Amino acid sequence: MSEYPRFSPAELARRRSAVEETMAKAGVSHLLAYGASGVGGAVGWISEWPATHEAALLVTPGEQDVLLVQHYNHLPNARRIATDADVRWGGPDTVTSLIDLLGARGTTSLGVMGPLRFAQHQRLSEAVDTVVALDADYVRLRLVKSAEEIDRLREAARLTDAAVAAMTDAARPGADVRALAAATEGAYLAAGATNQIHYFAVTAMADPQMCVPGQFEPARLIQAGDVLTCEISANYWGYSGQLLRTFTIASDPTPHYAALHGAADAAFDAITASIRPGAHASEIVDASGVIEEAGFTIFDDLVHGYGGGYLPPVLGTRSRSHRPIPDMRIEEGMCLVVQPNVITTDEKSGVQTGQMGWVDAQGWHSLHDFPRGLVRLG
């Protein structure tokens, strides 16, 4: 048994082939996959090393990959985890080391995937003939998952379910909202997962002041009569689950919150029924019309792709659309989070429900097992 989760050689070869095909279409002779501070998934997708402080992976067809990492003390662990790469310290300056490598390999053109800073991009542009942004191409490579990726996402979903279960055990009158985060993370850290997100909103049902979970927990005590909404994702080696739920605290749901959640449940059912291979993104938006028919709207995104990033299609409703509906169709193997955050138009009250699922020939299927519904705690 490996010390760290790993994909099979066949899966990594599939990715490598897709990357080299992308490079050929873009007309580049080298690829830089770059990541920093945990951002930049291409590094891990190709090499299996999750970018820590900084990582630069140089890919040249016919040559061994070179992975430059920062800081120096990260080098031993990167050598244990990275697959099929010559792992080196990035030196005092990673871009300088990268430019030296490019010079040795014969610099012509460079494709880039990842969040390079402006100054880094400028220096690389001065060192090579052509720099081509391949971020959009990387996103396309991540849209359709392999069977092994679905298995990894299923494990992430299992750990996310466990996190929400632990959070509900902690959500009692008198508990600090910040303790919910501790309970959430405690459910999956020992299994090798880390926090992707845990967002909470706690407000009084009788006088609601929050319609969507927040990114930072307040120093507030939970009280009987509160409503708790959450959005939780456990990250298991580059793949995250996502579960959204609403709970009431030591009190039954008020008629108002029952109506909100009823609309959210109806929207969830209509949206998931509309998702199938070949369905256009506009069909999914149309299915959400039950929300407006009930007199409500949304704040959070309605649907988004997931598994390797926050992926297309990112959709809203007709009453809350922050961007044009993309001209794209659903494909078998995609993963989509369906998450109707049904709220009042004054943005004072709202509920969350939904979860991540994957698409096969028959349609959308949940990867989570946590029960649905508006549930009373205590």
Each predicted region: which residue ranges?
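Active-site neighborhoods and metal-handling regions in enzymes and metal-associated proteins
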Residues: 1-378
